[in-house]
UniProtKB/Swiss-Prot annotation:
Regulates arginine biosynthesis genes. Keywords: Amino-acid biosynthesis, Arginine biosynthesis, Cytoplasm, DNA-binding, Repressor, Transcription, Transcription regulation. It comes from the Bacteria. This is Arginine repressor.
Length: 156
């Protein structure tokens, strides 16, 4: 039972540290956790936790590259709360733009890239909260738009 309590405290502290948006390296996170009393933490454990909680590196308000958590925690899949991270989907004759919660664009772009050409997506470019999607065929941009919207259960 004590191990579960320690694990819960570690996760809580880990998330709180990442919410500070001031740690740019895994070693800085290790040091912060050790200063909070988690002496058995190491870089490989931090690396696994970053992956598990879907942490991404993004620029903070000071324009420093730091680790942070997406708005919804946990490793996302198309059927998980990932759809909650998509705020807007719009398009013109040649491109689709997806606006996301801060820090979530790269994660969502990776998912879109993985479905790729069969679904009409030639490629993506992601910033912190915006994704540009280049359709495979601009004559079928509306079809690709509907595919993207349905993937995230997005309705206008």
């Amino acid at each position: 039972m004590q191990a579960n309590k320690n694990q819960d405290e570690l996760v809580k502290t880990f998330k709180a540290i990442l919410k500070e948006e001031r740690f740019g390296s895994q070693s800085e996170i290790v040091n912060a956790l050790q200063s909070e009393g988690f002496n058995n933490i190491n870089q490989s454990k931090v690396s696994r936790m970053l992956s598990k909680f879907g942490a991404v590196r993004t620029r903070n308000a000071k324009q420093e590259m730091v680790y942070c958590l997406p708005a919804e925690l946990g490793v996302p899949t198309a059927g998980s709360p990932l759809k909650n991270l998509v705020l807007d989907v719009d398009h013109n004759q040649s491109m689709i733009v997806v606006r996301t919660s801060p820090g979530a664009a790269q994660l969502i772009a990776r998912l879109l890239d993985s479905i790729g050409k069969p679904e009409g997506i030639l490629g993506t470019i992601a910033g912190d909260d915006t994704i540009f999607i280049c359709p495979s065929n601009i004559q079928e941009v509306d079809k690709t738009l509907e595919t993207v919207k349905s993937l995230f259960n997005y309705a206008d």
